[in-house]
UniProtKB/Swiss-Prot annotation:
Designated name of the protein: Probable heme-iron transport system permease protein IsdF
Function: Part of the binding-protein-dependent transport system for heme-iron. Responsible for the translocation of the substrate across the membrane.
Gene that specifies this protein: isdF
GO molecular function: transmembrane transporter activity
Source species of the chain: Staphylococcus aureus (strain N315)
Subcellular location, principal: membrane
């Protein structure tokens, strides 16, 4: 009971930190806002300068929160579905497949803009299915599976590079220049995906069982692995439709959360949601304040942090095999 209460207290503290970071991100920038500016705006209702800043910063902050949460949860789900601690949507090519589909849809059927998360999901499924089919045939270990995923990532990024030579082929570049319609589109996918994940979370712990143990208790492990994998691909692909590829968030957060609160998915999913949202928000905030008025993409900061972590996890995986 004491441990459970400590986890609840930690979760509340993380929520407070997240809200405080969101406020700091909102008032920080080339044009700074004071508390008095916000107070005047919300009491009088008229302040054109504040209104313009709200329309520039608030969509960006909300999208950072949703994308961070979705990618962190997607990483946790992929690791559960594939039973691979190194799995992450960007590394195994899911994000690249989703981005190619997104780019093609915007070129040929731009009128379906509001359906981009769903269309990107179709593109993200292709590399995921290839990984599953190859794994079922060759039974890769954790590192070999990631190497196959990296090969798919390189292949699909090559295709994407060719496609983007067309000046009409536009792909999203991070969190900059986001508008309210982007928030609305992503919010639908975020709510749907995260609610389904919370409903599924009691079953996720059973994915650690082997096939014989699962069948002995009447648990259809293959069905839930597929459901978990598809949900992970959906969450990651929906973010790609709005912000493009963001690396390593799906690796960093689940491993940090496991160190903090253990591997119980009922606890891991909510904590991953909050910490993922906070981490991307911090990366975006740092990118805006390190060298103003220039902006460093949040993805660059995540790669600087995530690259060494991936190397560490690969070394740890190899050590465990010895």
């Amino acid at each position: 009971m004491m441990i459970k209460n400590k986890k609840k207290l930690l979760f509340l503290c993380l929520l407070v930190i997240l809200i405080a970071t969101a406020y700091i991100s909102f008032v920080t920038g080339t044009i700074k806002l004071s508390f008095n500016d916000l107070f005047t705006k919300f009491t009088t209702g008229s302040n054109e300068a504040v209104d313009s800043i709200i329309d520039l910063r608030l969509p960006r902050i909300l999208i950072a929160l949703m994308v961070g949460a979705m990618l962190a949860v997607s990483g946790a789900l992929l690791q559960a579905a594939l039973q691979n601690p190194l799995a992450e949507a960007n590394i195994i090519g899911v994000s690249s497949g989703a981005l190619i589909m997104r780019a093609l849809c915007m070129l040929f059927i731009p009128q379906l803009y509001f359906y981009l998360p769903l269309l990107s999901f179709i593109g993200g499924l292709i590399p995921f299915l290839i990984i599953i089919l190859l794994h079922s045939k060759f039974r890769f270990n954790a590192v070999s599976m990631i190497l196959v995923g990296v090969a798919l990532f390189v292949l699909l990024n090559g295709v994407l590079e060719i496609l983007t030579q067309n000046p009409l082929m536009k792909i999203p570049q991070g969190l900059t220049m986001k508008i309210w319609s982007d928030v609305y589109i992503l919010a639908v996918s975020a709510l749907l995906g995260l609610i389904l994940t919370l409903l599924l979370s009691p079953k996720l712990n059973l994915l650690n069982l082997d096939d014989i143990q699962a069948r002995s208790i009447g648990f259809n492990i293959d069905r839930y692995r597929w459901l978990t994998g598809l949900l992970a691909v959906f969450l990651a692909s929906a973010t790609v439709a709005i912000v493009g590829q963001l690396a390593f968030l799906g690796i960093i957060v689940p491993h940090v959360v496991r160190k903090l609160v253990g591997g119980n998915y009922r606890v891991l999913i909510p904590f991953s949601t909050v910490i993922g949202a906070w981490l991307l928000l911090v990366a975006d905030l740092l990118g805006r304040v390190i060298q103003p008025p220039l902006e460093i993409p949040a993805n660059a900061i995540l790669m600087i942090v995530g690259g060494p972590m991936l190397i560490y996890l690969i070394c740890q995986s190899q050590r465990n095999r010895i």
